[in-house]
Amino acid sequence: MASTLTTGLPPGPRLPRYLQSVLYLRFREWFLPAMHRKYGDVFSLRVPPYADNLVVYTRPEHIKEIFAADPRSLHAGEGNHILGFVMGEHSVLMTDEAEHARMRSLLMPAFTRAALRGYRDMIASVAREHITRWRPHATINSLDHMNALTLDIILRVVFGVTDPKVKAELTSRLQQIINIHPAILAGVPYPSLKRMNPWKRFFHNQTKIDEILYREIASRRIDSDLTARTDVLSRLLQTKDTPTKPLTDAELRDQLITLLLAGHETTAAALSWTLWELAHAPEIQSQVVWAAVGGDDGFLEAVLKEGMRRHTVIASTARKVTAPAEIGGWRLPAGTVVNTSILLAHASEVSHPKPTEFRPSRFLDGSVAPNTWLPFGGGVRRCLGFGFALTEGAVILQEIFRRFTITAAGPSKGETPLVRNITTVPKHGAHLRLIPQRRLGGLGDSDPP
């Protein structure tokens, strides 16, 4: 192995670094595949402020190396530094080593299988509240509707918010963060920009969100019925961390904002893309209807997983090298950020034959190998909420297709990806026309397809 090891950085484009940043942050859907075709399975980019030296890996064996590496050698918290201005320094996404393990252990009880079973009825109830308001034969912006629905769910699960006024204000302000342009996000680390719009508006909005969160934390700390509540905030307030180190308000705030933002928008985007694919695949949609009525969660989950593969919402994971490291045949210098390209891994013809086809059966026949499907990352940094997201998505699909079938409508017949903040969403909102079922489930006496 030593004879094949190359020291330094892999080849990459010689474009000006800030141009690379724009292409990477805003136009990654075509930029990354172009770089992959030109430079191969491992290549370098310069994309400040995200990373001065970014090494992109696409092959499953290299991705496995990264996910299995000692977390002391690869810091994901440092790799995510651009998110720190929103999520906060104590966020489970921003911390490393012992502090990350501590935060993860505190959050984990809220996402166990037992906890997920407890959330399921609530998810279904909220989904029905929203979907029963949809008008038959109407055309909807599915991205907007999925954002509203998943945010309502996550506010109840994470925050336990039922006050309509608090929900409305928090929803409005969180949407302002969700809709942020990548260029604004890239400018957040520069203090001189804080005095100018749109960054001034961004930080003002964040201050108002913090006021709501801290107010709710203070109120919840003195709640005599805390033990009867099952939301994540109440669980965290009841956690006995250590006698000398209870969770501070700042630590609670950072976990809450992380879960509120990361816990709904990615699922909303994945659902809107999945619905758009189903609108163009009537045979698969017919199977989804039967699965919805019959309670076949396995098939519904496979459909969602294929939607996540076909349309990658989060393009990559990042880890900063703390000391010289050997990954994928390269000895990388300290300070390099290693990037597992979820976007390119999901589009691989080797890992996913006919990758542009929407085929949920991939996830039912055992053909999807480890380290080739990566919406939730991997290793010790795998998303804590992966089980929640899959359960939520399957339940929402079930509630939709018990009542409607769908066709594509308007500009969404030619839907294209758009990078919004750090997520990739349908540019036109994935508009759908709602066709009511003849009765609940829309099924006659014929056998399922």
From Swiss-Prot:
- Give one Pfam family, short name only: p450
EC number in record: 1.14.-.-
What's the cofactor?
heme
The answer on whether this UniProt entry bears the keyword Transcription reads: no
Could you give a GO molecular-function term held by this entry?
oxidoreductase activity
**Which top-level enzyme class is recorded in the Swiss-Prot or TrEMBL entry?**
oxidoreductase
Q: Which UniProt keywords apply?
A: Heme, Iron, Metal-binding, Monooxygenase, Oxidoreductase
What is any one of the record's Gene Ontology cellular component terms?
Answer: peptidoglycan-based cell wall
Identify the residues that bind heme. 383
- Taxonomically, which superkingdom? Bacteria
Stored InterPro entries = Cyt_P450, Cyt_P450_CS, Cyt_P450_E_grp-I, Cyt_P450_sf, Cytochrome_P450_monoxygenase
Family label: Belongs to the cytochrome P450 family.
Q: State the name under which the record lists this protein.
A: Putative cytochrome P450 135A1
| Top-level taxonomy | Bacteria, Bacillati, Actinomycetota, Actinomycetes, Mycobacteriales
